[in-house]
Each structure stands twice: as structure tokens, then as C-alpha cells.
């Protein structure tokens, strides 16, 4: 699947401290220690609707990780999937009387446009679930052969399920107790009451063909992949086990990331799928989480269509800490526009105070678990000093603009 266009990233003199991120599995902020090539997998969209601000906040978070690694001199192998075969896509297509393939392609194209407008650096591998069917089948075959998975006793729909106890470390990623797992499994796409399952928490890895659904041939009969195994297969086949960061929204902690890890660990025998599990908070509107099921969405494409500067959208979402649940408001967007203009005015000066210390603070705050509120405050301070008191450093405005562009993805000057 085609990704979106790369945007140029300026080079900024100097180097920041090593990146530290909160790891969901270890429940602490700790260093991320990639090799020469940093590796990251972020779960992508199910393309049955446009990109909302909750999506955007997640992808902006991991765009910062990408930029920080690049600033530190790493090559970055970033992988993102598209869940282009799944129940919500089929349900929306049926509701609207549209071909599910056409719907998925259209919404994926709109997502790419939104990401490009927000200046999110594209993944090296942008992979649809449909493209990874063969890889999934190989994994399911391995599970069945090893006893990690079984076929339910249902002649009509012989689905294949992964045993939740197939790995002894199951549950380490989320840290949830059984009661919480049962609750979220039922709420987030699981099927605990499916007849024939050995354990309500056993996860679907191959869904036998149903009337009106697409299917692919397999040794277990025609069907399609379960949700979690798609990400396991795509990640293992592009960046392997033990990659640096797996990312997504906090609603993916369980079941999706727990099972993606368990599937991969069962397939490889490794103890840990990813070295860091990093999750973003939810974006709310009117006191509730922004979600398709609630219908309280603010779409990036709609804001762009209304003439909102994508850079202001970006700054608005970065104004809060990535791990916090936080609201989106009109005032937040207005403040982001004000901040953007402040920075642009300062970057347009012919001379200003030295920006060296400010750039160092920007790097320091971002390296400290992506502390964007402090990073943005530091930039505000320099911009106000430059506009109010001036300075004699003729390189400072361009250095400031380059750092904001490279590390935050916000362009202050015309190229």
C-alpha cells in the first residue's frame, strides 16, 4: 500500500539527551535505547470514516518519537498498518450500500491527505491487512500445530481461536486483572460468549467465511484474519521481534496490544514482542471521549475544509501531554492559532536573542517523555523575548524556525 509523501526535515546543530518514554508494561518512564536503526510499529486506522482528532493526536505523538530519533542521528524503520478488512468496514459499507473495498480505499486516501497536511512523517512500510493474509495464515498454521490455537467444534463456522494461556506471560503488557480483561474484551471487539470456546478470553485468529463477507483460502477453510493477529504478522515480517516501540491509543492496551504481543511471542518463543509499549490518552469533546460509536467526532478534513491551518491543529493537540486524556475546545484551537502567529512573527525577525539555550530546552523537554507543554512554553518565552526586546543574533530566528520544524513538525517560514 502506498504511503504519503515525505516532508523535508531540517538539520539542527547539536544533539539532545536520550529519549525516555513511559512503558505501559513496566509502568514507568525509562530510556528507549535503539540501535543505529530505531524501529517502531503504530496501529493504523480501520478506514470506514475520516480521520478524527483522536486519531491525529496518536499519530502526532509517534511523529515526535520519529523526529527525536532522526534528530539523534538514527535511521528510523517505522511501520503502520491499515485494518482494511474488518467488521466495522463491512457494516458501514452495507449501511451505505457501497463496496467495502471502494470505501476503504477512499477513506485511506483521505487519511493520507490528512497526515500529509499535518506534516506527519510517513512510515517506511504502510501495510494493509489484505496484503498480509499469507503471513497471517502461516502464523495460524504454526499455532494450530503447536497447540496454541484450536478450531471450534462448529461445522458451519469452524473459526480458529488462540488460547489466552498459550504464553505464560499473558497479561504483562496491560497489567490488568481477570475482571478488567473480561470487561474490556467484551467491550472492544471480543466475543466471550461464542459457543465452543475453551475460555471466554480466547481470541479469534481466523474467522471462517460468512455469507456476504470476503474470504481467502487457507488450510483451515476459507475465511479472513482476526484483528489482533494482523498486527503481529505485519510487525514480525517487517521489523521482527523485540522492536523498540509499539504505539497506539490507550484503548488498544487491551485486548489489541495484549493479544498482538501474545500471538507474536507464541510464534517466536521470545519473551517480549516490543521493548516499549507506549499509549496515548483519549481526546474528548463535551466531556466524553471522541469516538465513532458516540458520533462526537471532529474531523481533520472538516477543519481543513473550513480553512483551519493544519499547523494550528497540530499545536492544539500537542499543547497537552500525550498520555493524558484531554478535551478539544474552540478555545484550545484559538490559543493554538495565537501561539502559531507568535512563533511566526519571531521567526520573521532579522535578529533576535540567541536561540541555542531554547533549542536545548526544547530537546530536553521532548526527550523527557515527550513533555510538549514545557517544550511549547520554552518556545513561547523565547518568541516573546525576541519580539519585546530584540537581540543581536542574526542566525537565531532561522535556527529557531529550523528547530521547531525538525522537532515539532511546524513550519514557520515559507520554504
Swiss-Prot record:
L-cysteinyl-5'-AMP binds at residues 43-46, 58, 81-83, 227, 249-251, 283. The gene is mshC. Its cofactor is Zn(2+). InterPro entries: Cys-tRNA/MSH_ligase (IPR024909), Mycothiol_ligase_MshC (IPR017812), Rossmann-like_a/b/a_fold (IPR014729), tRNA-synt_1_cat_dom (IPR032678). Keywords: ATP-binding, Ligase, Metal-binding, Nucleotide-binding, Zinc. The lineage of its organism: Bacteria, Bacillati, Actinomycetota, Actinomycetes, Mycobacteriales. One of its GO terms (biological process) is cysteinyl-tRNA aminoacylation. GO terms for cellular component: cytosol. Pfam families: tRNA-synt_1e (PF01406). Binds 1 zinc ion per subunit. Residues 1-20 are annotated as: Disordered. It comes from Rhodococcus jostii (strain RHA1). This is L-cysteine:1D-myo-inositol 2-amino-2-deoxy-alpha-D-glucopyranoside ligase. Catalyzes the ATP-dependent condensation of GlcN-Ins and L-cysteine to form L-Cys-GlcN-Ins.
